[in-house]
């Protein structure tokens, strides 16, 4: 949805989750343990050779040290590692600084602490949610598109539940509805319908 919105507005799309996934992928490649190698992970976070490039379709190409890792950072192994490394305050501080550098011009930013921590002063903030089963089915379909295989729905639902729990209870940048954000339940709405609703809110604020 954020990609589609950015395309409609004619601005860059930034997925802050991709920065954590990129760090997690680099950590996995370097055989760093997300629990025991905290100090080395923090150093890696501050020096992460990350480039995000917008695609003609409105998406984002992710490059680490010049290598395209757009697909590789979406595996479940990387997702689990990203959930772990994102718990540490020093790593989150490095990632927030990186995200702010990447968004020096007008962008649509997607992320779990975007409106509360990274860009609390953003002029437009939206908090999207959906029924857990619907979220699990959407994630299952995303994994099938990326890798050609469909993991069991129960497994995907459990992974989302685990990730939500970690994010809601972390000490720094927990998952919350940001102050001033408009909540939108997407359970019975398509991506296009949600984008139209968001654009309507933006146009009303501007007029």
Residue ranges and their predicted role:
Residues 63-70, 137, 141-145, 166-207:
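NTP-dependent small-molecule kinase module
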Residues 17, 66, 95, 108, ...:
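Residue-level signal for inorganic ion chemistry
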Residues 13, 125-127, 181-184:
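Conserved beta-strand scaffold positions in the cores of enzyme catalytic domains, especially
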Residues 20, 38, 42, 88-96, ...:
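Amphipathic alpha-helical transducer elements in NTP-driven molecular machines
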Residues 113-115, 126-134, 145-159, 164-169, ...:
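Anionic, Ser/Thr-rich low-complexity intrinsically disordered regions
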Residues 4-73:
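N-terminal phosphate/diphosphate-binding loop that engages ATP/GTP or pyrophosphate donors
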Residues 70-146:
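ATP-dependent NMP and nucleoside kinases share a basic, alpha-helical "lid"
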Residues 1:
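Hydrophobic positions on the alpha1 helix immediately C-terminal to the Walker A/P-loop
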